[in-house]
Amino acid sequence: MNHVNKAKELYKQGFYCSQAVFAAFADELGLTEKQALQVGSCFGGGMCKGEVCGACTGALMVLGMKYGRYKADDWDSQMKANDMAIKFLEQFRSENSSYICNELLGCDIATPEGKAYAREQKLFAEFCPKMVASAVEILEQLSK
């Protein structure tokens, strides 16, 4: 199963956007799916506050695992990771108008009213999977 389909399937199962994106890459990152799902569990819904889209934070976790530093003095890796993160966010915003969850959804999901609106409009069921797919597609483009 390719990354896009894996992420969409995980999202469809009920995992957050952040979990779906990050876990779709678990194998190649040397993680179990369980580990990736656990790590991504607090980032969905714009970190539960409608902030940076969880699909984006999941993607940034993938980039951090691929390019980030694990030694304090490895600034080359840190700069590469930062560069990739900036490229990702710029591309995501270019394709989707924003990378802020509330802006993408057009409502404040940190409020009961906003969350109810998102459910009524089927945004979580129909719009968010598109953001998950977009994030994964951009990750794949950047990895070429």
Describe every region a protein language model picked out.
Residues 81-144:
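C-terminal binding/interaction regions
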Residues 17, 53, 101:
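Short cysteine clusters
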Residues 47-61:
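Conserved phosphate/anionic-ligand binding catalytic regions in large, soluble enzymes, centered on
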Residues 5-12, 42-51, 120-124:
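A short glycine/serine-rich beta->alpha loop
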Residues 28-38, 65-84:
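Phosphate-handling active-site elements
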Residues 1-29:
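Active-site-proximal helix-loop elements at catalytic-domain edges
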Residues 22-41, 107-112:
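Acidic-glycine-rich active-site phosphate/pyrophosphate-binding loop
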Residues 23-27, 61-68, 137-141:
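Short glycine/serine- and small hydrophobic-enriched flexible loop segments
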